[in-house]
């Protein structure tokens, strides 16, 4: 622990800063610090600027803050926020050396570099890399959630504002301030607004303009209010005819969104809430109020960047999932989260209390058909997923032609019922359906997880595979296993689906995970010889490796 006097002495010994003193009140812009020092940061032989070196209590986690004292007197430059604090280092994923004097000196050297480059203009293009970061610091900036198709044309999109009622004892001026901060929701159409539950919110037309500029468009100075000149400079990029047809000329409140394409290929999204104003040619005049909107993108293309690099065309593949139980429920939810947007789910059973602890759904959905409950859950939580539900047996759905296997790019059987899987397999083979099938199942008490990928022309056949089955007694029967077991099987499935659509699988594939047998043995049950013989935790068989040559079905399917 260093005292303020010790820190002052250490800084005074440096040639980076001079005239160091201790600030008695260790508080800057409502932030309380352990120690605040003041000094003149040396930029070159002729110039130095007064800065504050603020040491937080948790400096070992948050590093040191450095503020420029007379920030408003400086030229507008990157890496300084609207309070004059310099953005020094990105701490995400960095292991910080627990050496406070060293951290202070490194921070001062970084601050020196930022100011030098700022005065010379060397780092001006950093504004482009962090455009939205500066836009968010504009005075009275308001959040707007944006879910539209990008890189298209100038057009009208739809939006809504969730307004709340005035609270008891709330002053009118406070209520107005709160309303001005209410989030705005913007979608491609009325249907896309449903993700935010805006059914009772009035829908408004919003002007959406796509701008391509040959020169860089920089963010406005965050120390000043957003100006009408900045707005009109952006409007000048819009062709006259389109501007007049998309944005009304009348004096009324309006919202404008700009999709700005920079010469470097970067794209920025900004918006403005405009009170009053008349459109005259390509400019707005007599605007009463201009409020910047920070666009929080919620379109699928943007959201999926964080989770995958898969070809977006694969998301459009049609997938049929049979069984919405413990395995199927997890598989369906994770397929939706993985970006697949066209799912058909089939299950004739309702969710019961006894399955709550191994199903993705909770008590809220008990006594509802599993497929319909899953659809409700996903539509509430995951955007842009089309789900078709069928609360009936798959055999009936196929024979009555409610669905057709050939309409899908992939079939997943997660029912865990081997007799049903044989029926699916038989129908596929007899009708020469060229759609691949993935079969998923768990073993009793979690001793195993299996995923099998079967291409057209070959067969899934439990008679040809030596796999231990479990049978319950009369009444309510079930195969005992926990939620974690189904999660493991789901992970096998997701990886397999990705490989199928990326055409990484040339042949049939069977993956078996060997689980722990302790729980099974506690119930006085014995493992099979196959379980004992398998030494690997993960066993992978391909092609005809898992075909039993003594099975007529497998031999017939493989031309034996």
Question: What are the functions of these language-model segments?
Answer:
Residues 25-91, 101-102:
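Compact alpha/beta protein-protein interaction domains typified by the UBC
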Residues 79-124:
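Structured beta-strand segments within beta-sheet-rich domains
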Residues 126, 136-276, 406-410, 414-560:
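Glycine-rich phosphate/adenylate-binding loop
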Residues 266-319:
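N-terminal charged helix/coil linker that caps or initiates catalytic domains
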Residues 309-350:
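Glycine-rich adenosine-cofactor-binding loop
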Residues 334, 400-401, 422-427:
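A short acidic, amphipathic alpha-helical/loop segment
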Residues 348-383:
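Glycine-rich phosphate-binding loop and adjoining beta1-alpha1-beta2 segment
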Residues 375-409, 415-417:
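A structured beta-alpha segment of the ubiquitous adenosine-cofactor-binding alpha/beta core
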